[in-house]
């Protein structure tokens, strides 16, 4: 029983530290379009340097998107990632 509890605690801590891919808003509908430079916009969760590189949400009245600094457990530092979030959420 102890090993099972230890594994569950480890998994929970790993998710908290590294985050979850859905935290970036990947499941929220977004518009994938070509940018003026010929590249495709970056989807939520992708690395970015400017907000205009990121795909925009399909519902801009309720969702906001852009390039934000976010902690990466894999890199051990803050990195810029495209993100879409619900405006009413305290996480936005």
Curated annotation (Swiss-Prot):
An MF annotation (GO) of this entry: toxin activity
Family the entry assigns: Belongs to the neurotoxin 21 family.
Sugar attachment sites: 62
InterPro entries associated with the record: Cys_Knot_tox
Domain notes: The presence of a 'disulfide through disulfide knot' structurally defines this protein as a knottin.
Record's function text: Probable neurotoxin with ion channel impairing activity.
Localization: Secreted
Keyword tRNA-binding: no
Position of the signal peptide: 1-19
Name of the protein in its database record: Toxin ICK-15
């Amino acid at each position: 029983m102890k090993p099972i509890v230890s594994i569950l605690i480890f998994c929970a801590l790993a998710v908290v530290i590294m985050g979850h891919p859905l935290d970036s808003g990947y499941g929220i509908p977004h518009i994938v379009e070509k940018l003026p430079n010929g590249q495709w916009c970056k989807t939520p969760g992708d690395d970015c340097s400017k907000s205009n590189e990121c795909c925009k949400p399909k519902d801009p009245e309720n969702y906001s998107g852009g390039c934000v600094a976010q902690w990466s457990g894999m890199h051990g530092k803050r990195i810029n990632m495209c993100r879409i979030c619900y405006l009413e959420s305290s996480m936005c």
